[in-house]
Amino acid sequence: MTLDRPYSILVTDDDPASRETFRDIFEPVGFRIFLAGSGEEAIDIVHRHDVHLALMDMHLPKLSGLETMAIVRQIKGMLPMILISADQDEGLMRRALSAQAYSVLSKPVSRSLVIYIVRRALEKFY
């Protein structure tokens, strides 16, 4: 997939190092990145910017990744969302997929896998 337009990715994770790692993965391949440290920040960014895909940690302070995803969907509709979790909890994965997450990835995520999944999601939705 060639990035024929500047797709924007919202990365939401309460760990600053994780956010920066995702920035370092996506910016060099041409994505515009917005970073949020909480669900509330993510919702604010979605209100103010054109976001094409959200990459979200499942465990966030106050609003969980799933709760944030539901609110973002009310604002943006069927925005592709990829949830990430350090937990290997099958129930959590099932809930994420039933909430229409595009994919659920386990931390740590390899650079090549996350780029592949993001590109596939963008191809499918846009």
Where are the regions a protein language model picked out?
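Active-site beta3 strand of CheY-like receiver
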Residues: 49-55, 60
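Short amphipathic alpha-helix used as the core "switch/output" element in two-component signaling
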Residues: 44, 66-78
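The C-terminal output helix
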Residues: 119-126
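C-terminal output helix
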Residues: 91, 109-118
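Alpha4 helix (beta4-alpha4-beta5 surface) of REC/receiver domains from two-component response regulators
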Residues: 67, 88-104
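Acidic catalytic/metal-coordinating carboxylates
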Residues: 38, 64-67
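Two-component/phosphorelay signaling modules centered on CheY-like receiver
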Residues: 16-34, 99
